Amino acid sequence: MLLQIAGVCSAQQFSAMVTSLESGEAAFEDGKKTAGWQARSVKNNLQASGADADNATSLVKEQLLHHPVFKAAAIPKTFVKLMVSRYLPGMEYGTHVDDALMAGIRTDLSFTLSLRDPETYSGGELVIEGNDGDTAIKLPAGCLILYPTTSLHRVAPVTEGERLAIVGWVRSYIRSAENR
């Protein structure tokens, strides 16, 4: 299941969140520090820390808990982790599967919320591999893609501009994707 969800935050909330992250207060560091053991060798991006990043991820979490489409599709029990990720030219995240357990908690669904419009950067597509081939996803700012954590995926190299997104993992009340 790949599900695109729009309208996670209001335009005003979204604008304030992105402005706050761009203000320079968010500290970005090597994303390998947050990668699971399987993905560490293929991860080349930056992750934000600090109050602005915490505020952004808290806002997104709160909005998703009240978003009817997200709630119906994910049936969220808990958010395992949310992070602000940034890709500059030359950065990418090679083919990997997200960790099935994070801090001892099962992860069922992964999501990426785009914070940049696709025309503001080149490359940087989220590519999800499947039996029918690859699906390249590059969403407008404010849109989210929800997909099973077990999906083999990658972020294509950014060749120009900056890819900025919030990524997260959800434990559902219902483990099986077929029953969700």
Question: Model features per residue range: what roles?
Answer:
Residues 1-76, 177-180:
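Non-heme Fe(II)/2-oxoglutarate
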Residues 68-179:
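Catalytic core of non-heme Fe(II) oxygenases with the double-stranded beta-helix
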